[in-house]
Each structure stands twice: as C-alpha cells, then as structure tokens.
C-alpha cells in the first residue's frame, strides 16, 4: 500500500522495470507550470520553473528579470503600458 504522501495529485507516478521483469512505481514531484504575463498570458522568459522550495534557494537576480515589472509582465505589455502612461501624462 502506498504512503499517504503519494496519494495526492502532486505526486507523479513513474513506472520502472526492475530486475526479474517486475514492475515498480516511483513517485516524483510534478514540475511547476511556467510563469505567464498578467496582462496577455504569454510565457515569461527569464523566470525559473520550479517548486517554491527550489526557487527560494536561488539568488535574487536569478528569480526574475531586472527590468520594470520583471516577472509579472512580458516586455511587449510593459512597453504598451509605458507608452500609454506617457501619452496620458
């Protein structure tokens, strides 16, 4: 019987062949989904993909791009927003 921690949806089953032609199940953590832009939903470049535990071990500069709204908006949406704010200013 599997342990309770493996019964949740966050554990991914991987079937392996063991010696003697027996099949065993390994459990792995699923990967986090890619970060997306808050405005248009496009995938964000420069933002790591991983669980929170793995990301907290990274340096601050490796967690998101060093530009305005880095890690939240894609460059196209940032440019559109800045142009719109400059025109309304």
Swiss-Prot record:
Coiled coil: none annotated. GO terms for cellular component: ribonucleoprotein complex; ribosome. Keywords: Ribonucleoprotein, Ribosomal protein. One of its GO terms (biological process) is translation. InterPro entries: Ribosomal_eL34, Ribosomal_eL34_C_sf, Ribosomal_L34e_arc-type. It comes from the Archaea. It holds the Pfam family Ribosomal_L34e. GO terms for molecular function: structural constituent of ribosome. PANTHER family: 60S RIBOSOMAL PROTEIN L34. Belongs to the eukaryotic ribosomal protein eL34 family. This is Large ribosomal subunit protein eL34. It comes from Methanococcus maripaludis (strain C6 / ATCC BAA-1332). The gene is rpl34e.
């Amino acid at each position: 019987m599997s342990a309770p921690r493996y019964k949740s949806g966050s554990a991914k089953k991987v079937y392996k062949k063991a010696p003697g032609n027996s099949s065993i199940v390994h459990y792995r953590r699923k990967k986090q989904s890619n970060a997306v832009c808050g405005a248009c939903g496009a995938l964000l470049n420069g933002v790591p993909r991983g669980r929170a535990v793995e990301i907290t071990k990274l340096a601050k500069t490796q967690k998101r791009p060093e530009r305005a709204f880095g890690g939240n908006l894609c460059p196209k949406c940032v440019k559109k927003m800045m142009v719109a704010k400059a025109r309304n200013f």
